[in-house]
UniProtKB/Swiss-Prot annotation:
Its main location: cytoplasm. HAMAP family: Thiopur_methtran. It is found in: Cytoplasm. Keywords: Cytoplasm, Methyltransferase, S-adenosyl-L-methionine, Transferase. It is an enzyme of class 2 (transferase). Pfam families: TPMT (PF05724). This is Thiopurine S-methyltransferase. Its EC number is 2.1.1.67. It comes from the Bacteria.
């Protein structure tokens, strides 16, 4: 999967993955993380998610990373915000108040860039990537945030052979293999959502589970 895949999806407005409301799991489970006010939250592959506004409204600073510039521009236009635009290395930065959206490749992000982030929110990043890229994504993510960081990860679990992604199937075993050496993982909830997902029903999927993980970075085992 190449970068232009997502660029074209945004240009053609093929964004069925975009939610027209704040994610209910975020609202339910984020407060229990107990983060300090004004903690900086890393949101990979953020799109124009309404979750960004919700996080800012709760008193957090938001660092969203998004490849498609159209998504970033749409976010600020739809919320009638006038961003300040600057350059940070290879990233074009759009900033307004507590929200910064960095337009560019997530894999160009460095630990120095995220040194002041102490939280992570991944609703649509890991499940957006095919398996080889997920391995690379997880390895890169593991090296970004400082120890003690907390966050939420939301995945979808189904038989990948029944339907092509995205969103891709990310099974519990994979999450634990990719992240478990660095992050403490706790399943907050898992829910069968097949009945709510016409695309998957129509595609012949027989089981679809949405799973929410609570993350706490403990550092690599020695």
């Amino acid at each position: 999967m190449q970068a232009d895949f997502w660029q074209k999806r945004w240009e053609r407005d093929q964004i069925g993955f975009h939610l027209a409301e704040v994610n209910p799991y975020l609202q339910q489970y984020w407060p229990a993380l107990g983060l300090a006010a004004q903690s900086r939250v890393l949101v990979p592959l953020c799109g124009k998610s309404l979750d960004l506004i919700w996080l800012a409204d709760q008193g957090f600073e938001v660092l969203g990373i998004e490849l498609a510039e159209k998504a970033v521009e749409d976010f600020f236009r739809e919320h009638q915000l006038q961003p300040q635009i600057s350059q940070h290395g290879v990233f074009k930065v759009y900033a307004h108040g507590p929200i910064e959206l960095w337009c560019g490749d997530f894999f160009a992000l460095t630990a120095e860039d995220t040194a002041d982030c102490t939280a992570l929110y991944d609703r649509a990043a890991m499940i957006a990537l095919p398996s080889p890229m997920r391995q690379r994504y997880a390895a890169h993510l593991n090296g970004l945030l400082p120890n003690g960081s907390k966050g939420l990860l939301i995945t979808m679990d189904y038989a990948q052979e029944q339907l092509d992604g995205p969103p891709f199937a990310v099974l519990d075993d994979e999450v634990r293999q990719r992240l478990g050496g660095v992050w403490q993982l706790q399943v907050e909830t898992e829910r069968d959502i097949l009945g709510e997902s016409w695309k998957f029903l129509q595609g012949g999927v027989t089981r679809l589970v949405e799973r929410v993980y609570r993350l706490s970075k403990q550092g690599a085992a020695r």
